[in-house]
Amino acid sequence: MAINTDFNLGEGVKAARKLLRTYVNVGTPETKEWFLVGSGVEDSSIELNPNTESVTDILGVTTTDVTKWEPAQSFDPFTIKGGSALAFKLHEIWTNKTPELLSQFEVMIVYRYIGTEMNGYEAELQKNCTINITSIGGSAYVDMPIEISYSNDSTKGTVKFEDNAPVFTPDAA
């Protein structure tokens, strides 16, 4: 794998939001079926939610350490649409009252502003993520906003696309 040393953007060019993509595996660990999340969502960021510890020494100097991140990402609205395997899977978890299944998702973040189509884009695969349904309802359509809590059980790698489907390859150890 080629080592990336810069973004695949021109000097001073801002990365379009659509280049940061979140996929959820709605298949099995053996037969992955990646669902791209974000259709109809105008704004979604991965909030890092850092845990910090600050100490002021006897000289009055404050130092702050980041001890961990608890990253999460909200998708609101997440409108129920025909053909949405993720919405159907979450709806089944809701109606079957099996919330323990909400913490067993594989989520992949693809950074399409790092890498190339030929060599692959930088990505990370996270296992045992939680996808929480925050509500269900709406006004004109049935929305089911979700929040993904990332696990930090992650593997870095690259993604290439075959027939519009992402294929993840872990980095060599």
Predicted segment positions?
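Intrinsic-disorder/low-complexity loop/linker signature
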Residues: 1, 29-30, 116-118, 164
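A broad "ordered helical/assembly scaffold" signature
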Residues: 2, 33, 41, 51-60, ...
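Solvent-exposed edge beta-strands and adjacent loop segments
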Residues: 2-82, 128-141
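Extracellular/virion structural assembly segments
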Residues: 59-126, 156-162
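Mixed-charge, glycine-accented linear interaction segment located at domain edges/termini
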Residues: 125-173
